[in-house]
Amino acid sequence: MNFLKKATPSLPETVADLKAVHPFYPVGVEIANFIANDKTVGQLLGVFAAGCVVILSATWFLASKAAPQLNKKDKLVVLWFCLSYFSYNHTRMGGAQDLFGQMWKEYAMSDSRYLTSDPFVLCMETVTAVFWGPLSFLMIYFIITMHPLRYPLQAVVSLGQIYGDVLYYATCMFDHYYKSLTYCRPEAYYFWFYFFFMNFIWIVIPGSE
């Protein structure tokens, strides 16, 4: 019996061990081949912000040169779809320890499903990467050239963004309330800033276009 007591750790010890493996929730969720980030949150956010400024500034400049007749609102729509293109495709641009991989792991603090091959998230991100990403890039061309299909395509892509976001929220809330599964860490900013605010943008802006 003494041997069994020594060989079998108590529940608190087991939970502590699991917490030490990775910081994601729910506690004990299996994250295959997890490697902790070697960059701080400040470094990741700084690089992300700088990257957005460079990409969007270059897009604004090129759009102004290619189509000087565009009004300010149309240029802002071009910036949105440019940002959409890079947002939808950045997860395929490298391994887990490159810049984008580490950003993705930081975001996963608010939703660990992105690191566990969750069926819904996997299917949703595949659809967005295959369809909404390239179509967002095509939208930039349609706006600049004033193509007659600009508004129909804009409606389709915007509806797809809203629909995907609503399902994203709904599936997470369903698991939380009906299965008692929480994918977000308990700190408030992970839920309100990462999970809620950063995704709510993809409902508000497409809905106002």
Q: What does each of the following model-derived ranges do?
A:
Residues 3-121, 126:
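N-terminal helical submodule of small eukaryotic multi-pass membrane proteins
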Residues 72-101, 105, 112-209:
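Eukaryotic polytopic
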